[in-house]
Amino acid sequence: MTRARHPIVMVGLCALMVGEAVWSMRNDLIPTLAHHAVVVLSAVVMVLVGELVRVHMPSGRVLAPISSAVGFTLVSLGAVQGSASFAVRPGVVILCYATGQVLAAALRREVDTTGGAAARLLSVGILVHLIRGVDVAGRTLWEWQLVSSTPRWVVAAALVCGASTALVIERLLTAMHRAHTLRTSTATALRDEFEEAPTVTFAGAAPGPIATLIAPVAGVLALPLALIPLVITMISVRRYTEVWRTLRQTIQTLSRLTEAGGYTPPDHAHRTAQLGRAMAQRMGLGEREVTALEYAALL
């Protein structure tokens, strides 16, 4: 199997999902968007910002937790103070989220080759069909949250479980693509994904329920307000990645001492480290073992 440069399968599934959304909304898409213009525009802008403000992990993973959190918020959003209740079909949520992603890609002027954007769109699409499309005792889960007799803690717990499930799907899809790209085993990629990514990823399960519960009082401002805990988590994770980046730069600098002294050919340590890393990935070693081997080769 040749190495894939683009997540073709996931992109194809995303294209089918967006196409189905457009087809299902072909008769009332414009009126629906106009009726919920404030919420839709706010969500698209926030998805755009979330796709641009990403977290680069030490292993090379690129995460966009704000983008995922905004998508999950759109899925569960109901009553909104000062605006009409966000009672829309699943296709509207999918199109809003995809629009924000496309605009972000256009501003970055680069195509996402990590599979992350496609995985996020697919996870949002799956969640919106579960929340807004599956009947439970005669009502969808989204309709149950509007029933005043439903305890708020039950609503919050259900929404957190739904968002967590979508995040697991996102990580699974990303791990499968990463395993194919790096030519390592899927089991190893899954293990590494759930060792490194959950710190910031699963913090994205909370903003959706928070925004949904406070939107009847706070209105559209509920969307950015609910993201504050996630933003704080992202800042902490970014500092963590900066420490690892500094460590890596220090080791790379030390590896050049033998070159400067004339004991090894130019870039010898770098070539050895890259070869060792590639072999370790082919053998199915985890990210920690691969990194340790790379650092040992550099030194």
Task: Identify the function of each model-found stretch.
Residues T201-L299:
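Acidic/His-rich, divalent-metal-binding segments that scaffold phosphate/diphosphate chemistry
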